[in-house]
């Protein structure tokens, strides 16, 4: 059977990335408490394509993923990227895996358990010279109370949910749980999936006693990361979904060196 993709292309235009996008696939990720967690990844897989090649082999991406049945971690990412380059005869390979990650959290006073969902992402690139660049990302929902509102009001203060997006490069493996805890510690208060009345009282009072602007939250996360010698680069963005405005408050910090 004729294979059109193996024919030569004469437009003299190499392609930076070509492959598959938004593939939903079952994956396993490392779980600090339970060892492993089954979840569903949304996966993008790309390779480069030289100017003389007409097309890549799209089916091989999924075949490879199914054969490997991967546990998704920084260590296995490098293996998958190398396999992509080998199977698709490519100089470089790139993969992104986004997945929901669940942590069981007890309510702060009653101890009632419930699962919190966090969106996580691993991104990796294997370059032509063999160097591998890996980025880990978590999105952590938080609560914040406005310091200005508390200061000027006779009673109460406006508060809202927010979202902290944290991406890092590191020398060694970092647990997802550690990144989440670092972010939650910088918020006015962390979120819980289940709150009884005694818990709701505790959460409300903790947030009120710990008011923070987006500027405070992003700086507190940045300081904690700068004090960790394992972290070589980070990007933090904080967005508060303002309860008294029809817009969000936003702040971001990037720090560190990206290897060329």
Curated annotation (Swiss-Prot):
Pathway: Cofactor biosynthesis; 7,8-dihydroneopterin triphosphate biosynthesis; 7,8-dihydroneopterin triphosphate from GTP: step 1/1. It catalyses: GTP + H2O = 7,8-dihydroneopterin 3'-triphosphate + formate + H(+). Its EC number is 3.5.4.16. The keyword Hydrolase applies. PANTHER family: GTP CYCLOHYDROLASE MPTA (PTHR36445:SF1). Belongs to the GTP cyclohydrolase IV family. This is GTP cyclohydrolase FolE2. It comes from Desulfosudis oleivorans (strain DSM 6200 / JCM 39069 / Hxd3).
């Amino acid at each position: 059977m004729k294979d059109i993709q193996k024919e030569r292309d004469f437009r003299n235009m190499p392609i930076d990335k070509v492959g598959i996008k938004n593939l939903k696939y079952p994956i396993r990720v490392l779980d600090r408490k339970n060892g492993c967690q089954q979840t569903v990844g949304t996966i993008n897989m790309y390779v480069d394509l030289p100017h003389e090649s007409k097309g890549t082999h799209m089916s091989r991406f999924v075949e490879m993923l199914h054969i490997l049945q991967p546990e998704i971690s920084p260590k296995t990412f490098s293996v998958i990227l190398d396999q992509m380059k080998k199977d698709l005869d490519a100089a470089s390979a790139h993969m992104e895996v986004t997945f929901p990650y669940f942590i069981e959290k007890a309510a702060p006073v009653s101890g009632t358990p419930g699962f919190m969902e966090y969106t996580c992402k691993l991104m990796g690139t294997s370059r032509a010279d063999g160097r591998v660049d890996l980025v880990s990302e978590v999105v952590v929902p938080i609560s914040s109370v406005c310091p200005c509102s508390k200061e000027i009001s006779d009673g109460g203060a406006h508060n809202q949910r927010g979202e902290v997006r944290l991406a890092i490069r590191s020398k060694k493996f970092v647990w997802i749980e550690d990144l989440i805890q670092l972010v939650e510690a910088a918020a006015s208060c962390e979120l819980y999936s289940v709150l009884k009345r005694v818990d709701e009282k505790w959460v409300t009072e903790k947030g009120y006693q710990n008011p923070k602007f987006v500027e405070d939250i992003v700086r507190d996360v940045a300081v904690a990361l700068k004090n960790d010698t394992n972290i070589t680069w980070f990007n933090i963005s904080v967005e508060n979904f303002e309860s008294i405005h029809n817009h969000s408050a936003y702040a971001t910090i990037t720090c560190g060196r990206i290897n060329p």
